[in-house]
């Protein structure tokens, strides 16, 4: 399942990856990590891909958590 924020983001994935647990791999184009036991890919524009997960309600909640953490950590770097 892929979810995208209503507002396009500009997330520095290399920078924010240091604050995420269970990062599987990261580049300037994507960050793969585990969140609540789910494999997730975050993209710089704020899109979030959940693998083998189809619960839309919880997906929106988890995407908000991920984007919120990434934005907070990205702003902390400024």
Model-derived features with residue positions:
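A short, structured beta-strand/loop element
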Residues: 25-39
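A common structural junction motif
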Residues: 20-24, 66-74
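Short Lys/Arg-enriched alpha/beta "domain-start" segment
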Residues: 1-25
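Short, compact, well-ordered microdomains
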Residues: 39-68
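A broad, low-specificity signal marking well-ordered, structured residues that form hydrophobic/aromatic
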Residues: 1, 31, 48
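A structural detector for beta-sheet-dominated domains
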Residues: 4-6, 34, 43, 51
């Amino acid at each position: 399942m892929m979810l995208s924020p209503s507002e396009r983001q500009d997330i520095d994935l290399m920078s924010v990856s240091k604050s995420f647990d269970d990062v599987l791999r990261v580049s300037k184009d994507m960050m793969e990590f585990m969140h609540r036991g789910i494999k997730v890919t975050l993209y710089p524009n704020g899109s979030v891909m959940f693998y083998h997960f189809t619960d839309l309600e919880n997906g929106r909640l988890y995407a908000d958590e991920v984007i919120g953490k990434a934005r907070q950590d990205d702003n902390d770097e400024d």
